[in-house]
Amino acid sequence: MDQCRASDTINLGVLTRGGNAYLLRYKGEENWSSDLSTASQALDVNVLHHLILQPACGIDTRNQHDLGHLTYVRGNEPPLEIIKNISDYDFVFFVNPPDLDQIFAVAETGETMPQKSTYFYPKVYSGLVTAGIGD
C-alpha cells in the first residue's frame, strides 16, 4: 500500500476470509450518489465508505448501529492479529491515510473528515494552560 501512495490513483487493499488478496484501483469513473465535494471524493476512505461498504454491504458508516459490523485498526504496519485471525472477518480493507493537502482541501470546503481518517502522529496538544502572574 505504501508503494501505491505515490500514485495519483486511489488504491484499496482487500484480504478475504479465504486468504485471497486484491488491490482495487479507483479510476474516478463512478457516479457518486452523495453530495460530497471533489476534495472529499478524493479520500481513499470515502471511496471505501460510499462506493463499497454502503452499496455492496449495506453499511452506512454514519449510522452508529452499522459500525458494530466494523473493526478499525490504526497504524502503518499490517494488522497482523487480524490477518492471523482472518476467519473472524469476511474482509479486511487496507486504506491509505489522507495527506495534509487532502485534509486542508476538505477543510476549505467546510466538510468534516470521515471518522478515524485523521488519526495521525504527532498529535497536537490542546487544552488550557495558565501561569501565575507576579509572585
Language-model-detected regions and their locations in the chain:
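Surface-exposed, charge/polar-rich loops and edge strands
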Residues: 1-135
